[in-house]
């Protein structure tokens, strides 16, 4: 399926029109939004790409800012890893295609040209990964013109919980292959990279999973497809997902707490990427060396961003990753 042809943003040209200093670097203390608490039986919800019932708001989630020190990984990129932090930095990605080879406004072009390189990069980065299945991608931009991309997500979140990860495996891998793959190690990993780096505006902050406690993550609901309804069933595993069917899944909304460590990579470029692990089944095993297995994350506004800095334009590719270990 090819999206309607629309102009590709020429955001990089902004930096060519004026003289800019290098992107901000170093640790920074800045506000990050966290969802407010809900008292049971109430819970947070949001409708994504499908309308809510008449009279129901798209979301009831409200953010509250907390001052967070975000540590810069530049120069110490190897200090984080997936097993401890659910975060890994990839560099030297010269084989991952970019514009003009990829038309970012064409779903078909992204799937045909970009997806295989992402799959190869993840297999290379994650030991033992034998199968990588991409189930979605999202492009974000700090301006919604000339293309109506979504803006950066400016509230801390975790895209799927453990039960949602199981449903994703069954939903996308089918009723035969899905249960078999669930017998091994299964993960959800985001591949995040800029499309116009280096990033000046709204970088991504990721909390080390080893420092975020389970009881500091609230469970909310995403309504993802079909006819909206607050009583629609949780995600039903199906062999061939139908975009018109009703579907929802749990996602996580963290609270900020002392002891959490947050990271970003200053000035991340187009030959770099972040692997942000959303779920790792090995974290559920007794005596596992995987600490938490899920990285909450959020974009944030850096007060050091210079005037006239280029907009952020980025892609996040959501992957199911399977290994036998």
UniProtKB/Swiss-Prot annotation:
Highest taxon in the source lineage: Eukaryota
Annotated stretches, region: Disordered: 1-25
EC number: 1.-.-.-
Bias type Low complexity, positions: 1-12
Keywords, sorted A to Z: Oxidoreductase
Pathway involvement of the protein, from the record: Secondary metabolite biosynthesis
One Gene Ontology MF term: oxidoreductase activity
InterPro entries to which the protein is assigned, alphabetical: AsaB-like
Induction or repression: Expression is positively regulated by the oxaleimides biosynthesis cluster-specific transcription factor poxB.
Key word Oxidoreductase present: yes
Biological role: Hydroxylase/desaturase; part of the gene cluster that mediates the biosynthesis of oxaleimides, cytotoxic compounds containing an unusual disubstituted succinimide moiety. The first step of the pathway is provided by the HR-PKS poxF that serves in a new mode of collaborative biosynthesis with the PKS-NRPS poxE, by providing the olefin containing amino acid substrate via the synthesis of an ACP-bound dec-4-enoate.
Family statement drawn from the similarity comment of this UniProt entry: Belongs to the asaB hydroxylase/desaturase family.
PANTHER family: BLL6449 PROTEIN, PUTATIVE (AFU_ORTHOLOGUE AFUA_3G13140)-RELATED
The name this protein goes by in its record: Hydroxylase/desaturase poxK
Gene this chain is encoded by: poxK
């Amino acid at each position: 399926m090819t999206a309607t042809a629309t102009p590709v943003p020429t955001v990089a040209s902004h930096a060519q029109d004026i003289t800019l200093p290098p992107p901000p670097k170093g640790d920074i203390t800045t506000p990050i939004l966290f969802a407010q608490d809900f008292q049971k039986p109430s819970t947070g919800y949001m409708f994504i790409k499908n309308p809510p019932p008449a009279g129901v708001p798209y979301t009831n989630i409200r953010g509250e800012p907390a001052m967070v020190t975000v540590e810069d990984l530049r120069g110490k990129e190897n200090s984080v890893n997936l097993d401890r932090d659910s975060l890994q930095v990839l560099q030297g990605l010269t084989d991952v295609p970019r514009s003009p080879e990829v038309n970012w406004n064409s779903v078909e072009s992204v799937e045909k040209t970009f997806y295989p390189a992402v799959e190869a990069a993840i297999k290379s980065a994650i030991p033992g990964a034998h199968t990588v299945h991409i189930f979605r991608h999202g492009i974000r931009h700090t301006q919604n013109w000339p293309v109506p991309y979504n803006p950066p997500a400016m509230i801390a979140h975790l895209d799927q919980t453990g039960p949602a990860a199981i449903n994703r495996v069954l939903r996308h891998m089918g009723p035969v292959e899905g249960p078999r793959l669930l017998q091994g190690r299964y993960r959800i990993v985001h591949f995040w990279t800029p499309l116009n780096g280096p990033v000046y505006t709204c970088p991504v902050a990721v909390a080390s999973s080893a420092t975020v406690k389970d009881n500091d993550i609230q469970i909310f609901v995403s309504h993802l497809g079909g006819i909206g309804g607050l009583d629609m069933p949780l995600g039903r595993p199906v062999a061939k997902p139908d975009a018109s069917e009703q579907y929802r899944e749990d996602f996580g909304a963290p609270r900020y707490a002392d002891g959490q460590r947050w990271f970003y990579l200053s000035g991340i470029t187009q030959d770099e990427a972040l692997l942000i692990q959303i779920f790792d089944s090995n974290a559920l095993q007794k005596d596992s060396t995987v600490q938490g297995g899920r990285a909450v994350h959020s974009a944030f506004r850096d007060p050091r961003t210079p005037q006239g800095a280029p907009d952020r334009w980025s892609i996040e590719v959501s992957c199911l990753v399977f290994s036998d270990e």
